[in-house]
Amino acid sequence: MPEIWLKYGGTHIVLDIKFENLLKHISSNLNLSSDAQVRAKLSGVVLKENTLILATDGSISVARAIEMILDLNRSIDLSKVSIETFSKYVGTLRANISNKACSIERIGSEPFDVMIKKFQKILIISHTKHDPLFGYCGAPTMLLRNFYPDKMTEAFNSRVTNLPAPGIAGPPLEIALSVFSELRAEVIEVVGNSYGISAIFHDNIIEAFDSALGYLSAITETKEISSGSTIICTSNEEGPHETLSSSLNSLWNSIHLVKRNGSAVLLAENTQGIGNGALRDCVEGRIELQNCLGGQTYVEGQEHLLYLRELQLQYDLGIMSTIPQYYLNGKLGLYPYTGSKEILNRLMEKHGRNHKILVISDADNILIKSNAEEN
């Protein structure tokens, strides 16, 4: 009996699954660069004493890039370099940066174009990943989400499907790129995971993002046969998945591998609860799950409600989380599991004792596409 350990918040849980019931265990296998290689890539990043380092993510990879850049620029007064990130990433970024002398501040509420005029230089550092709405996530999409609500609404309404579309660059991404095509700022796109950095791309916002997408697609996209059920584990980093809102992309990025009427189970501890935005509005009764198609002003995480609504018609969606069952099942329609044994037992009862289960670890950093014969 294979013993599979899966990340669950700040700990790991064991999945005691019989060999004959395991279709495959897939995890990201990024080729990591050495510190010397990363430093060489970053050696051309020159800071000035009135520089804003804007981190669009709090991941370990982004934190490591920031630390190396600061170390390479010790000749200037680093106290005059501002490091800012979005409020939901402040705690995570602070925890991931080992140099506690670094001051990580929350980005203010002023418009983006007003904020950047205060600084002599702007350096944006982003973590390139897959995204179910935009296809890919990076500096253009994160800036659009957080600074341009009207354009974000336009991007959401421009989608060509109500289903997740990770790895597909469509109209929403085109809108994001068009908004920042003239942005005069240096951008670093990082491809990596909790173990290190795989690649660094330093250029203007469009070129850096485009290069990162090409690299990400080449190393993380693979093919696998579809399965009747899939157990999905979020990334090996605890911080980025403290809320349900920040965890669901792992489910959306993998759901296409599940056969119709099959089961998908997400493992996400969610120590900080539901999160803000549309999911919270839904569980608190301010928005209905059935009223999420768009048209009105976009609400953060609105795509989660859209995907829940659409995919519950096709799949049995479940989650193992610390969030109360009343919210998970009663409000969002997710079947709540209490442990890995219950997950396996229910999947076997539903699909048969000879059923084979696909297990995906680190779903943030891998995009698995169905083989053509299974589509």
How should these model regions be labeled?
Residues 36-54, 73-78, 222-230, 257-259, ...:
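Glycine-rich phosphate/diphosphate-binding loops that line cofactor/substrate pockets in enzymes
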Residues 29-37, 100-109, 204-207, 334-343:
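Short acidic-hydrophobic, aromatic-tinged amphipathic segments that line or gate anion-handling sites
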Residues 247, 252, 256-375:
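C-terminal non-catalytic interaction/assembly regions of soluble proteins
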Residues 101-236, 242, 250:
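Conserved, well-structured core segments that form the ligand-binding/active-site neighborhood
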Residues 49-62, 82-85, 232-234:
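Short glycine-rich or small-residue beta-strand-to-loop segments that form or flank ligand, phosphate
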Residues 58-80, 247-258, 264-265:
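Histidine-anchored nucleotide/phosphate-binding helix
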Residues 52-54, 68-100:
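Anionic-ligand anchoring segments at beta-strand to alpha-helix junctions in alpha/beta enzyme folds, i.e.
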Residues 1-36:
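N-terminal amphipathic/basic leader segments beginning at the initiator methionine
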